[in-house]
Design a protein with these regions (language model features):
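Membrane-embedded alpha-helical transmembrane segments of multi-pass integral membrane proteins
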Residues: 41-51, 71-81, 85, 115-122, ...
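Loop-to-helix transition at the N-terminal end of transmembrane alpha-helices
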Residues: 59-75
Length: 205
């Protein structure tokens, strides 16, 4: 019996390890592409609104471009470190480490979508305040329009990122997770031999 299970352990281990590494490689590539997308958006805003800030003499448009540049200073400050972190990411994580990293990523993007709604709402609040504040009407409208634009983009960005990561995990990672059984001795692979289920808990991942 032991001679039978010894090679079975190694076959089963590599049947999990190989697709797990592939999943992590794909997850890292997704993060890199997302950060490049965020960085591209920030760069575009620097160029377009930078020109606008420099050439528009006054009025609502001036404050709109001003806020776009300032806001995307934060975006580029997130995109560059995010890309570097993804580039340095290791695809050789254990299943438990991969699941933790995946759930953390999904949670971050999901929380961010809620924050993005707050940014959009703040933009509408500023526009509303502009109606009763004639002295700062242009500034409030310009800043408000910028927050609506930037918040709207980030909402679509974060929601799209969450959906991409979540679908990717459902397609492969969570299927791998279902082949693992938790027991008092740790994590083990689980098979069905014939019609009777069999589990072995001494193979640690």
């Amino acid at each position: 019996m032991k001679l039978f299970f010894f090679p079975l352990f190694f076959v089963s281990y590599f049947s999990v390890a190989q697709p797990l590494q592939q999943f992590n490689e794909e997850r890292i590539q997704t993060d890199k592409r997302l950060m490049l997308g965020l960085g591209s958006w920030a760069t575009s805003n620097f160029i377009v609104s930078g020109i606008g800030w420099a050439t528009v003499p006054s009025g609502e448009a001036l404050y709109f471009h001003q806020m776009n540049v300032l806001w995307n200073t934060v975006n580029i400050g997130l995109a560059i470190p995010g890309y570097i972190k993804a580039k340095k990411g290791s695809p050789t994580l254990t299943l438990a480490e991969t699941i933790r990293a995946q759930k953390k990523t999904e949670k971050i993007f999901l929380i961010n979508t809620g924050l993005d709604v707050g940014y959009i709402s703040s933009g509408f609040i500023l526009r509303s305040l502009a109606k009763t504040n004639s002295d700062r009407q242009d500034q409030l409208n310009g800043f408000g329009n910028s927050l609506i634009l930037q918040g709207g983009f980030l909402f679509l960005f974060d929601l799209t990122a969450f959906v991409i990561h979540n679908r990717h995990a459902k397609k492969s990672l969570y299927k791998l997770e279902s082949t693992i059984e938790m027991s008092s001795t740790g994590l083990g692979l689980k098979w069905n031999l014939g019609t009777k289920p069999f589990s072995r808990n001494q193979l640690f991942l």
